[in-house]
From Swiss-Prot:
GO terms for biological process: L-methionine salvage from methylthioadenosine. It catalyses: 5-(methylsulfanyl)-alpha-D-ribose 1-phosphate = 5-(methylsulfanyl)-D-ribulose 1-phosphate. The record marks 157 as: Transition state stabilizer. Pathway: Amino-acid biosynthesis; L-methionine biosynthesis via salvage pathway; L-methionine from S-methyl-5-thio-alpha-D-ribose 1-phosphate: step 1/6. Catalyzes the interconversion of methylthioribose-1-phosphate (MTR-1-P) into methylthioribulose-1-phosphate (MTRu-1-P). Substrate binds at residues 48-50, 91, 196, 247-248. The lineage of its organism: Bacteria, Thermotogati, Thermotogota, Thermotogae, Thermotogales. This is Methylthioribose-1-phosphate isomerase. It is an enzyme of class 5 (isomerase). SUPFAM superfamilies: NagB/RpiA/CoA transferase-like. Keywords: Amino-acid biosynthesis, Isomerase, Methionine biosynthesis. Belongs to the eIF-2B alpha/beta/delta subunits family. MtnA subfamily. Its EC number is 5.3.1.23. The active site is at 237 (proton donor).
Amino acid sequence: MKLKTMTMEWTGDELILIDQRKIPLVEEYVSCKSYKEVAVAIKDMVVRGAPAIGASAAFGYVLGAREMFVEDFNAFVKKMEEVKEVLANTRPTAVNLFWALNRMEDSLKKYGKIEGILEYLEEEAMNIAKEDIEVNKAIGRYGAELLKDGDTVLTHCNAGALATVDYGTALGVIRAAVEQGKKIKVFADETRPYLQGARLTAWELMKDGIDVTLISDNMSGWSMKLGKINAVIVGADRVAANGDVANKIGTYMVAVLAKRHGIPFYVAAPTSTIDLNTKTGKDIPIEERKHTEVTHCGGKQIAPDGVKVFNPAFDVTDAELVTAIITEKGVVYPPYEENLKKLFEE
């Protein structure tokens, strides 16, 4: 079984990831032949974006199964708990990571025997990856209906093919609209401190021939005031039961500005990102990353030695600021606490 997309390649023996830390200057790849190597790749942001992290973890689980394999099924299940724990401890905010690992573990236990288990787990990981692509295309189709011909969309971070197995969530909506023949322009904010907008979104859209303009983060409000923005579309790392959205740091700021200027603020996310067990955004753990991501840029120090740094990787946007949540099952509007539940009742 093999899979190859812009973000990842599964050869059957290893997981090869495009190194997103190096884009756009260099296109390099990192080969992961063990579950611990996959864990390091997730932790170090070789791969990032909630759906891409989830799929990578699923393939990491497969590699771990091969490393931990023993003939006794119960002993094997026990050893796989360690694999799951190592992979789960990489990034705390993205719920797709835990969703994918729980699905892999449930599949293992449901299969219930040692014969053929490695092949079965590989097939399940492939299913997770392939389903993600189809889900993203469905999100794109639903979301494209919200965009008019000639619209300019502001994006934050990267919720494109690079953040998923392929096609993307927020950028998937833009791709789908363009495929429908609509003329869509994109303003991509740079997304400090990791510059996913400048490095990844701009690179990805230019590869697709989609009209993209790069702005710094502090230009988004003025761009809105000048009437240059018709809609905002972002992805999500976790959506709480009440509609609060955890996403890349700076998302909350963009949402507040959109509200102030009467611009619709859309969140594009698969149902696997919706966590009904998390009541509100206050219950979402927010990862904090190393201070050098703020004090350095492009490998060069830009701040004084010893300065204190606060570097949360994510923030939480209140549900009241979200116009709608675009999923593979349709577009969800407020009240979110009621309507998000309906997605899982169908």
